[in-house]
Every structure is written in C-alpha cells, then in structure tokens.
Amino acid sequence: MKLIPEYPYLYETHFHTAESSRCGRSSAADMVDACKAAGYTGIFVTDHHWGGNTRTDRNLPWEEWVDGFCQGYYAAKKRGDEIGLDVFFGWEAGFEGTEFLIYGLTPEWMKAHPELRTDLPFGDFAALEDPLTVEKQYALIHEAGGMVIHAHPYREEPYIPQIRLFPEYVDGVEAVNATHSNPLSKSHNEPVFNERAWAYAKEYDLPVTAGSDIHSTDLFCGGMAFKHRLKGPEDYIKAVLNREPYLLTDGAKWYDQQGNLIS
C-alpha cells in the first residue's frame, strides 16, 4: 500500500479474528504479521460481539464469555507487542443485522457491564428480559467515554433483514468499507454501499471513518491515515470527533473527509 507522505501513520479500524469471530479465517497473530508487513502502524480488533457472529459460547457466565470473546484481541496484542504493531481494543455490536463499531473501552469495563447483551435474531440463546437496544448502547458507551460508529450502514446481505439508520445514536459513519469497493474483495463487493454511506454522513453532518472489515491475512489495506501516531483509542476518538486531519482508503484509492478522491 502506497501511503500519502503527509499522512504516514496507517490504521486498520475494522478487523476480525478466527479466535473470536465465527467468520474469521486467520489467526490473530498471523493477521498482525500481515498488517505489519503491509505497512500499518496499528489496528483496532473489532470482533463480533454478543448480538453478532461471535465464536464464544453465549451459555457461559458473562465474565467467562468476555474472557473468551477477548481471545482474539489478547493474541493480537501479544503479537503486536512482539513485532512493534500497535493493537487497540474494540468490538462490533450487532442488532438483528445492524452493526456498530465501538471504540475507547476495555475488556475490564466490558466485564463490569453484562447489560451489553442484546437480543439475538438467530434463536441460539434464550430471550433476555432487558436486552440492550441501540439507544441504550449509545448512552452506555458515551457515559464511559467511548465512541459509536455505524458500520457499513447500507450493506445488503441475507443476514441484514432491513436497512436501519440511527443518526441520533451514533458518533459517525463508516463511509469506506473496503469489502464494498476494493477490487480484491470477494464478498459484499458493491461500491454503491459506500456511496450511500458517504451521502448519509453528509446529510446528518456526521464524521466518517474507513476500515477493511478483514477476516484473514488476505488484506485490502484499507483504513485511515494520520499525520501523527495514535497513542491509544482516545487519540482516535478525539481525531474523529474533532475532524482532525486524516485520510480514508479502501486500499485502492484515497479520499479526504468530504469524499473527494485524493489519489
């Protein structure tokens, strides 16, 4: 991936591992090695959470479930520390196919909040008495200082019964999902999904993000590039919410925050 010289720090913001996501095809360590070789400065591990395609048994007690869920992150962090790739924690929350990327919190915080469990559309766990909703999620994550990004809001797939938008309950929009537009993508490959996401963000004046949504070592090299190195998720949140200088890429093309083609 050829970087723009003024924006030398590239981050993957949408990343699934075989340890924690059923759809993951490569181990966290192998994916970290691939990202380092591709020129990334860091990654956010965002495995599928309770209401999505998680690999961890939902019948486990909550704290044990969180430990299992975090195995992909822990493995990625261990390998990242060994080879010099920054690895940050996040997750992808699912609500009957509508998904959100969560940043800025920790596994320890997650263990203390069993109310993160959502109702499940697939019938593999008993219904909850008080499941998390999109509205409750926004309040809970914000209270803790985290950030909520609507992932691929216009993707059309059988696992997504309907397109649902929640502009008042998100901090931003994933306007560039590399699986939609990168020529190497073999799934969800429909650029109009990104075009609609850009329009949605502009209509509601929401910040935009970019990520590859990768599940294996077959990288697209999508993500976001910054002028400075991010010290942690807090720097990422600050940059997005304050619309600090950064570029977005699907691994094939570069865009500014208004959606203009840079390169």
Q: Where does each model-flagged region fall?
A:
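Glycine-enriched alpha-helix->loop->beta-strand junction motifs that scaffold or abut catalytic
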Residues: 107-110, 143-147, 167-173, 206-207
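Distinct, well-ordered alpha-helical segments
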Residues: 98-104, 109, 155-167
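Short, conserved beta-strand edge motifs with alternating hydrophobic and charged residues
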Residues: 148-152, 174-175, 211
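C-terminal functional module detector
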Residues: 1-8, 30, 45, 132-145, ...
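A metal-dependent hydrolase metal-coordination microenvironment
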Residues: 2-135, 139, 175-203, 215-218
